[in-house]
């Protein structure tokens, strides 16, 4: 997969800038990259982006994903993860996006947390759009991805560097 151009849309300018620098370091300037700041909660902004740039493929990775934080802020998890995903799906469908890939999580399998529930609902939205639009939609589930923001791996690394112990969020959790 080699895109003709790449559009990075993120609410956090620092993360978007870091990604831009990483892409330019690894791939040079062979692929034109445009960075835009905005939120998937803002349907109007999404429509502006789709109308201006006409993307054909969307990789959707935006989400609140820290399990303990979402347990104490469940409404924010729903607004960002579920409603934001719905906004993005609707805008993509309205602007003739051909393929939509949602990055999900292993926590969406028989969810036991607010975050897991929101991601499972997002997967169900993906299934609905896949069955009712011309857009090819898929959700892919990942576990803890090394080097990703919000992964438990950096926490484990820091605990190990300090000599332990390595702790889990819940003593009953199995990983």
PLM features: what roles do these ranges have?
Residues 4-7:
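Short beta-strand element of Class I
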Residues 19-30:
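Short, conserved SAM-binding/catalytic segment
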Residues 54, 60-123, 128-130:
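Conserved Rossmann-fold NAD(P)-dependent oxidoreductase catalytic core, especially the SDR/UDP-sugar
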Residues 34-57:
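Conserved Rossmann-fold cofactor-binding substructure of NAD(P)-dependent oxidoreductases
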Residues 12-15:
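Helix N-cap at the beta1-alpha1 junction of Rossmann-like dinucleotide-binding domains, i.e.
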Residues 28-33, 133-135:
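A short helix-to-beta-strand connector/capping loop
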Residues 35, 102, 139-141:
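Conserved beta-strand scaffold in the Rossmann-like NAD(H)/NADP(H)-binding core
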Residues 24, 90-93, 114-175:
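NAD(P)-dependent short-chain dehydrogenase/reductase
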């Amino acid at each position: 997969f080699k895109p003709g151009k790449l559009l990075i849309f993120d609410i956090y300018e620092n993360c978007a800038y870091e990604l831009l620098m990483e892409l330019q370091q690894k791939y040079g300037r062979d692929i034109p990259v445009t960075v835009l700041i905005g939120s998937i909660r803002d349907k109007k902004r999404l429509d502006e982006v789709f109308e201006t740039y006409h993307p054909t493929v969307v990789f959707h990775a935006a989400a609140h994903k820290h399990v303990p934080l979402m347990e104490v802020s469940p409404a924010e998890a729903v607004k960002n993860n579920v409603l934001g995903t719905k906004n993005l799906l609707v805008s993509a469908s309205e602007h003739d996006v051909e393929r939509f890939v949602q990055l999900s999580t292993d926590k969406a399998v028989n969810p036991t947390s607010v975050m897991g529930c929101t991601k499972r609902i997002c997967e169900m939205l993906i299934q609905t759009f896949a069955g009712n639009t011309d857009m090819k939609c898929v959700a892919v589930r990942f576990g803890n991805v090394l080097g990703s923001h919000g992964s438990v791996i950096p926490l484990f690394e820091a605990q190990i560097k300090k000599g332990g112990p390595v702790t889990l969020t819940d003593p009953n959790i199995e990983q």
